[in-house]
Every structure is written in structure tokens, then in C-alpha cells.
Amino acid sequence: MAEKSYKYRIYPNKKQQELIRKTFGCTRYVYNYYLDKRKKLYETDKTTYTYVKCAKDLTQLKKEFEWLKEVDSVGLQTSLKDLDVAYKNFFSGSAGYPKFKSRKNRHQSYRTSFTNNNITFMDRHIKLPKLGLVKVRDKQVPQGRILNATISQEPDGRFYCSLCCTDVSFVQLSKTNQFVGIDLGLVDFAIFSDGIKIENPRFFEKSEKKLAKLQRDLSRKSIGSNRWDKARVKVAKLQKHISN
């Protein structure tokens, strides 16, 4: 048994998109708010708030800012857990001091945990807290038990949902005790020791040239204009294609 993640492209309606973006903002606000409080305390006497302390304080913060109640409460709690992990990594010496999250980051996301069957994969839909049923095209049903879901938006505007599952069974392949050597090159993509050759389709070179042209077009547009935004999305989509 092991853990496995399943990433789906989701197609939220306009109301769901608005709520997703609002959740991005609220989880980012909570993270930055308590990072600021912990930062000031650390600068004063080299101590910090615990996760439990922040979680209790969040209840009062939601009374002060009613709009925090409009989004998934588990998502807000998860942002506190992420901050707590960031501090533990800092104090253990494995990472630098936690940084504030920026709304200008073109990749936005939040994570929510499975509880009381609040995350379910149904026929071409994923049920998510506060969002309800969100459309997906992929028919692949996640195996095992769902632990959490990460909802994200890429720079090209597309939305995704990644389901992290545990207790996933894998088929153990039988050993063949056969070996093959692979030589990767520029002229031929790969040459196997048994004589098989795979030609280099040069997709990367073609995509790189196309990307350079799109980036030149983007640089000529007025920043913030509709044409600039359309050109930016084209660049982001091609960058996503190249990275895949």
C-alpha cells in the first residue's frame, strides 16, 4: 500500500470560479496575518505562537472579518498548518525564514482535508467543500482513501484539483532478469543496445522557437491591456505544454 496523487483538470462555473479565487485570497490572508504576528513575536523575544494558539485566535478573527466565513474553513486551518510546518523547518535549519505570500503569484492554490465524506469523486464530477459538484472530463476514479484535495489555478487560467490518496495498491511486476542499455543523443533521441533507434522529433526546438515569438509579441503589448492579457495566456499555455 502506498500514497498516490491524481491530478484532474476541473471546469468550475462562474460562481465556483469566484469562490475559488476568494478562497485563494482568504487562505493567503490568514497565512500572512499569522506570519506577521509570529514574526513580530520572534523579533521581540525569539519565541513564536504555536499552531494551536493560532487556530484558537482564528475563531476570533473570523468574527472580526465576516468574509472569512464565506470560504472553506478547513482550507483556512490548512494554511495555518502550512505556516507551522514552515516555522518548524526554519527552526530545524532545513529552510529559511517563512516568506509572505503574494497575490501577484500567477500560480495560486489552497488545500483542504477530507472529513465526513466532504471530498468525493463522482461521475465526471468532484464534490468539494463549499464548491459542491465541480465538472471534470477525466473518468479515472482515484484508488484508495482520499486524504486531501489541492485546488489550483495555473498562469494560463486553467483550474486543477489534485487528490492525494492513501492505501493505494500497486501491481508488482515480475522480474525478467533482462537488461538493455540506452544512449540518449542529439541526432537520434535514443539508441538501445539491441540496435533499436528512436528518431529525435525535435518537438522541444520547435516549441522553443514558437515560445520566443510569442514572448516577443507579448513584449510589444501594453501591460494590463486586453491584448496583453490574451498574449500572456498564450505564452503561459505554451510554457505549460513545454514543461509537460
Predicted feature residues:
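Nucleic-acid substrate recognition interfaces
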Residues: 1-244
